């Protein structure tokens, strides 16, 4: 099961904007790029996510798709805690084809806290 449509980055133009103007946060396995949307309305747009996995990670599409599913699952778990109004692209670094879901969840939590996207909880409480 994927992410809700409201929470997906779709067009290459959106990905390019995040890559060019977004802030970068990285861990051992993941790279998080964040572009905050400055919306003048009182209702900010929901946070949107995109996942980019290069063929350098694995030549096999099966492996890349499995990694995408694991990352989407981690995002779904964290979605209620995520502040609205950002566009986020998550990239995978190096050889992570052997990583488990729990590793992605833990690293994604750390990166989202570092980027101040998870709100309402202190670092000690959430980790």
UniProtKB/Swiss-Prot annotation:
The keyword Secreted does not apply. It is an enzyme of class 3 (hydrolase). Keywords: Endonuclease, Hydrolase, Nuclease, RNA-binding, tRNA processing. One of its GO terms (molecular function) is 3'-tRNA processing endoribonuclease activity. It comes from the Bacteria. Its EC number is 3.1.26.5. Belongs to the RnpA family. RNaseP catalyzes the removal of the 5'-leader sequence from pre-tRNA to produce the mature 5'-terminus. It can also cleave other RNA substrates such as 4.5S RNA. The protein component plays an auxiliary but essential role in vivo by binding to the 5'-leader sequence and broadening the substrate specificity of the ribozyme. This is Ribonuclease P protein component.
